[in-house]
Amino acid sequence: MTDQERLAAYDRMYADLLKERDKVLSDMDRLRAAGKNRGVTYQQLLALKLTVQNLIGRFEIYGIKEN
């Protein structure tokens, strides 16, 4: 794998993390609006949100930030 390919892979991974974060937040909002914010699905989404935000934060430590 060349440096260009590696950089492109990191860019794709960062973009995918941002998309996943947005989807998780949307799903959480939908469940919250339905009054299901104490259910197992909501709790699983909350854990996933924290994991994804942690990964995004690690990118930001190295200077890769959302536009």
Language model features with spans:
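Extended, charge-rich alpha-helical interface modules
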Residues: 1-67
